[in-house]
């Protein structure tokens, strides 16, 4: 595609402003089962999103080919689409920032590693899982995945941006059985080099995780101090992250409406959106509208400081975009998305948090976030599993319990914040947090 040709042709056709969003994604997936490659797929998708303002309305056209022969067709589609728009929303194509930040991305040596070596790494992990404990009855899956994504934004207002993003990861799932009890657990890890992953240590941690779940039982219902482990806390924060979206606040479907500048959480809680995080999965110098990204506090020492905006929500609230306008794919509309959003970690070890509890519950897994959570009120009632703590020690696993409360209230009643920040696969992370009291329903 001769982009300069397209930009000039759009102007000549009477399109007031014109943008080319070009995305190319290549994905590789290797699945191992019982020592053999059970699946090996390589897929590549090239997509181009064209936007143009014609008679004050935004028209769009999507292409899967970058052939210049499609130019006349695409421009006509944009005009027709714009003429069908009845919305009175003001259309905008961004004019660009004065400068854009540098994002440091760790070099990914896995991309050039021969497939045979990636498969051998999976085989080594699978064998370590099988050899660890006789209670490991099945290695359900051992997978390697990698994603290579390139994107470029060019428009008639002088914006010419481009970047690349790479990610490689391992995922595994195992089954453990002891007597009549069977449990399943999984784990994953981003890797940039073979040296980033020790197969034996990875397998030991996953096996310990699943074996610890065996023979869990409910606890007596009541209010307990509850330690939400970092992964469970990240899942909960992910499900509620929409409360920080500017459009949700503007529409009144966020509990944070009219709370800017107010203390909403414990003063030890600070929540950051950091698109410049080195080697962060969601790191980016600019969003999908061409707006420069920057590090910002959503909550600082308990005070609600700012929300996340794309160009549309910023205009609705008479402010500027925070560089959080992203697409789910090249053919998706621009939405609001966080970029490496996390709760800053504290200074208490996981072991010390456990040791501080006379009697309490550790929650390691929560499920039912789609049904047991009200994203507006932040009330939650979630199926959970974890461990019972007595006298500062883990005494047994627990399952078939429900943890319930209100997120906003819980975040005002915190006993300790861990030093174990972990980013989730969604790009949202949290340390483990010990809450003063949450309702547990068991037996």
What are the roles of these predicted feature ranges?
Residues 259-443:
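Dual-mode signal for accessory low-complexity, basic/Gly-rich regions
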Residues 1-291, 300-303, 391-393, 429-443:
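Active-site bordering "gate/hinge" segments
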């Amino acid at each position: 595609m001769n982009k300069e040709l397209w930009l000039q042709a759009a102007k000549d056709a009477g399109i007031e402003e014109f943008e080319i969003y070009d995305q190319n994604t290549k994905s590789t997936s290797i699945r191992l089962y019982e020592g053999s490659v059970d699946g090996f797929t390589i897929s590549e998708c090239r997509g181009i999103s064209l936007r143009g303002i014609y008679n004050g309305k935004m028209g769009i056209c999507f292409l899967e080919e970058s052939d210049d022969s499609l130019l006349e067709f695409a421009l006509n589609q944009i005009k027709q689409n714009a003429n069908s728009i009845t919305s009175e929303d003001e259309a905008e194509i961004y004019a660009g920032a004065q400068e854009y930040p540098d994002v440091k991305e760790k070099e990914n040596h896995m991309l050039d590693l021969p497939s045979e070596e990636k498969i051998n790494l999976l085989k080594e992990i699978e064998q370590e899982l099988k050899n660890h404990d006789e209670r490991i009855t099945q290695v359900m899956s051992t997978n390697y995945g990698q994603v290579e994504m390139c994107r470029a934004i060019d428009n008639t207002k002088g914006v010419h941006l481009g970047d690349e993003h790479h990610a490689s990861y391992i995922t595994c799932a195992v089954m453990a059985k002891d007597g009549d009890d069977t449990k399943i657990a999984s784990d994953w890890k981003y890797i940039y080099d073979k040296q980033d992953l020790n197969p034996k240590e990875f397998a030991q941690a996953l096996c310990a995780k699943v074996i610890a779940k065996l023979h869990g039982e409910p606890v007596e219902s009541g209010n307990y101090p509850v330690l939400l482990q970092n992964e469970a806390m990240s899942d909960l924060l992910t499900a509620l992250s929409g409360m920080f979206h500017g459009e949700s606040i503007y529409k009144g479907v966020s509990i944070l409406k009219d709370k800017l500048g107010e203390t909403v959480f414990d003063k030890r809680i600070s929540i950051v959106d950091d698109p410049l995080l080195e080697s962060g999965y969601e790191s980016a110098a600019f969003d999908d509208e061409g707006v420069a990204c920057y590090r910002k506090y959503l909550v600082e020492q308990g005070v609600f400081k700012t929300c996340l905006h794309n160009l549309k929500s910023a205009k609705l609230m008479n402010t500027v975009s925070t560089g959080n306008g992203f697409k789910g794919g090249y053919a998706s509309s621009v939405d609001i998305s966080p970029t490496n959003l996390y709760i800053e970690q504290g200074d208490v070890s996981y072991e010390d948090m456990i040791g501080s509890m006379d009697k309490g519950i550790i929650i390691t897994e929560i499920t039912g976030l789609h049904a047991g959570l009200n994203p507006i009120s932040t009330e939650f009632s979630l199926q959970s599993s974890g461990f019972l703590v007595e006298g500062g020690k883990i005494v047994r696993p627990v399952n078939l319990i429900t943890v319930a409360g209100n997120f906003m209230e819980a975040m005002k009643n915190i006993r300790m914040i861990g030093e174990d920040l972990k980013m989730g696969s969604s790009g949202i992370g949290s340390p483990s947090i010990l809450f003063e009291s949450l309702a547990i329903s068991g037996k």
